[in-house]
Design a protein with these regions (language model features):
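Aromatic-lined substrate-binding rim segments of carbohydrate-active enzymes
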Residues: 2-58, 62, 111-130
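Active-site region of glycoside hydrolase catalytic domains
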Residues: 67-135
Length: 135
């Protein structure tokens, strides 16, 4: 199946540490619901979780990109998933980009365990989501 890829940036979901931008998430949900109304096929969109959009100062940019920071990233994406759980157009998520966003983890050999923890975080309440590796 061909998917439409929609980027979702951590700094838009959680612009300050442990503070989620509910207005952004409501806007994302409204956009996805509108697309459903306008004919988007069910399970046709994959969200592409990215680290930083490049806009403004992002609190996590100065942090070491380690497993602990990746857990915070995962929590933010899980929070976003809760806000859009009723959007039928969402098929799931691309797996995080370990070649550019999380290169330190990839070099440390932690990519596979981080991927598994990312998927496991979603399994309990979002088991219907697909997870697709980058090519």
């Amino acid at each position: 199946m061909e998917y439409e890829i929609k980027p979702i940036f951590w700094d838009e979901v959680e612009p300050e540490c442990e503070t989620y931008d509910e207005a952004f998430l409501a806007s994302l949900r409204a956009e996805l619901k509108e697309r459903e109304t306008n004919g988007a096929k069910a399970a046709s969109i994959l969200l592409d979780p990215r680290f930083y959009s490049g806009k403004g100062n992002f609190w996590a940019c100065g942090e070491k990109k380690d497993a602990s920071l990746f857990e915070s990233f995962t929590a933010a994406m899980l929070h976003a998933a809760r806000r859009i759980k009723d959007c039928a157009a969402i098929a799931g998520f691309m797996l995080p980009d370990f070649q550019s966003d999380w290169e330190d983890l990839a070099r440390s050999g932690l990519e596979d365990s981080c991927v598994e923890s990312f998927k496991a975080a979603f399994a309990k309440k979002h088991g219907h989501y697909e997870f697709v590796r980058r090519r």
